[in-house]
Amino acid sequence: MDASDRSMAVKRMEMVQSLRQKGLVNERVLDAMQRIERHRFVDRESSVSAYEDSAYPIGYGQTISQPYTVAYMTTLLLERCPPPGKVLEIGTGSGYQAAILDALGYRVYSVERIPELHDRVVGLFRSLGLAISCRVGDGSLGWEEEAPFDGIMVTAAAPRCPEHLLEQLGDNGCLVIPVGEHNMQQMTVYRRVGERFEKELFHHFAFVPLIGREGWN
């Protein structure tokens, strides 16, 4: 490990400790975030501050979520739908969230609306040796050919939970999604119990919009 790698490892450890101090204490999630090198998922300009608790632009009007948000959503999923299992991510973006899910032991499928981001992240996953299945498409419609899923995580905001995603949940599966208006959404978890869905409401966040047939136009 060279000096740069050691420096990044220290920054990663400090990021994890900061998340713990903010109340995110699931050790499996924190361990995954300690292992996955976030600086590889941002551009060179942002890499020096990759372990600060901030979101960064990744192009095409999209962002890599701040570490707190990643840890928060991952904890909601993990505590209700522990690995191993089949998880669908909506909004591949930088690929960081999918890599965290992969590190936890899930079989990860991810849908990205923007072809350029998809192509970039597929190359990154290949270089990192990550076996994550990706496709370009309307994330609000899910990935019907691979359904059902044990878990679904939506990393963009929707005005309501897309019916297509609910239909692609397996029994006892859970879906984590920010739902609300353009400027503010409430993190919401749906769990499938037979033919009905139970709903839990959590903290408020601000995400980029989910664009698609069952999202924002």
UniProtKB/Swiss-Prot annotation:
<dbReference type="Pfam" id="PF01135">
    <property type="entry name" value="PCMT"/>
</dbReference>
<dbReference type="InterPro" id="IPR000682">
    <property type="entry name" value="PCMT"/>
</dbReference>
<feature type="active site">
    <location>
        <position position="65"/>
    </location>
</feature>
<keyword id="KW-0949">S-adenosyl-L-methionine</keyword>
<dbReference type="GO" id="GO:0030091">
    <property type="term" value="P:protein repair"/>
</dbReference>
<keyword id="KW-0963">Cytoplasm</keyword>
<dbReference type="GO" id="GO:0005737">
    <property type="term" value="C:cytoplasm"/>
</dbReference>
<dbReference type="InterPro" id="IPR029063">
    <property type="entry name" value="SAM-dependent_MTases_sf"/>
</dbReference>
<dbReference type="GO" id="GO:0032259">
    <property type="term" value="P:methylation"/>
</dbReference>
<dbReference type="GO" id="GO:0004719">
    <property type="term" value="F:protein-L-isoaspartate (D-aspartate) O-methyltransferase activity"/>
</dbReference>
<comment type="similarity">
    <text>Belongs to the methyltransferase superfamily. L-isoaspartyl/D-aspartyl protein methyltransferase family.</text>
</comment>
<keyword id="KW-0808">Transferase</keyword>
<dbReference type="GO" id="GO:0036211">
    <property type="term" value="P:protein modification process"/>
</dbReference>
<keyword id="KW-0489">Methyltransferase</keyword>
<comment type="function">
    <text>Catalyzes the methyl esterification of L-isoaspartyl residues in peptides and proteins that result from spontaneous decomposition of normal L-aspartyl and L-asparaginyl residues. It plays a role in the repair and/or degradation of damaged proteins.</text>
</comment>
<protein>
    <recommendedName>
        <fullName>Protein-L-isoaspartate O-methyltransferase</fullName>
        <ecNumber>2.1.1.77</ecNumber>
    </recommendedName>
</protein>
